[in-house]
Amino acid sequence: MMVPRISASPVFKRIFLRWGFVTLPIQKTVSHTLRRDFSAPCRSMVKCLLLRPGISVHSAQDRKFYSTEEKSSQFDENKSKSNNGKKNEPHGIKGLMAKYGYSALIVYILLTCVDLPLCFLGVHSLGEEKIKIYLNRGKQLIGMGEPDESKVIQDVRRKQAHREAVQAENADKVEDASRKTFNERWQEMKDSTLLAELLIAYGIHKSLIIVRVPLTAVLTPSFVKLLQRFGIDLMKKQKKVFQTMASGAKIRYKGNNPSDFIKNEGTALDITKRKPRTKGQKWFDGLM
């Protein structure tokens, strides 16, 4: 009866894959089993592998790991460079001005002139009573409002009745408006809700910038084409202005020190005499 021999190759593979190095007792036992099961060429090849403990499967895995790590680091560097390039590019209305010139600014100002009055009319159409109620609710958020809204409504109606009575009394009298003192005018402004309406309308107007900028991007190309039909090209004029400014600001160094420079002719701009930015210019940049 033939008894099948169990091959030692699975045992050898387990030992070889678990440890990258093989100790001397394991070498003897494995070589003893190989004498019985493997042929002479296979035994010589396996012995050569066993006598070189420095070679392991982990080395190939480490090479793959480090190669993938290098690729990921290169990808992260390229991604950071692209993100830095995107951050340096202007966005919003400044990006549109860099692309279309002053035409984008004109379209944006026209949309602003339409948007702000519409917001004010929408707020003013609510009426003094509703505006006072909304203002009282806003004050309640910071703990300064009246908890009972009925009192607010009664106060508004009482002031309206008093104002109508004063206007009816002064209807028969010819009174010069210039005789009113500053305190009287300020009291009238405080009693009216025009200032509150204007502030609310301006807040709504600023929140609608997410609508104005896309509308500017949509309408600016057609506006540029319309101007070009009439022979007006604001982009060329803007480039000429910047070219003249750049030619006037040219300098050349006469030494290794960057602060030591010579003006390029009498048309060059004197850097030391440049005026600082005014508050109006800073406000305009913040508004854009």
UniProtKB/Swiss-Prot annotation:
Keywords, ordered alphabetically: Acyltransferase, Cytoplasm, Transferase
Cytoplasm recorded as keyword: yes
- InterPro entries reported in the protein's UniProt record: FAM210A/B-like, FAM210A/B-like_dom
- List cellular component terms (GO): mitochondrion
Where in this protein does the record put region Disordered?
A: 68-90
GO MF entry, a single one = acyltransferase activity
Going by the entry's taxonomy, the superkingdom of the source organism is recorded as Eukaryota
Localization per Swiss-Prot or TrEMBL: Cytoplasm
Cytoplasm as a keyword of this entry, yes or no, is yes
Give the EC number(s) under which this enzyme is classified: 2.3.1.-
The subunit structure is: Heterooligomeric.
The task this protein performs is described as: Maybe involved in N-terminal acetylation of proteins. N-acetylation plays a role in normal eukaryotic translation and processing, protect against proteolytic degradation and protein turnover.
Q: What else is known?
A: Present with 1240 molecules/cell in log phase SD medium.
- Quote the protein name from its UniProt record: Putative N-terminal acetyltransferase 2
Gene name tied to this protein: NAT2
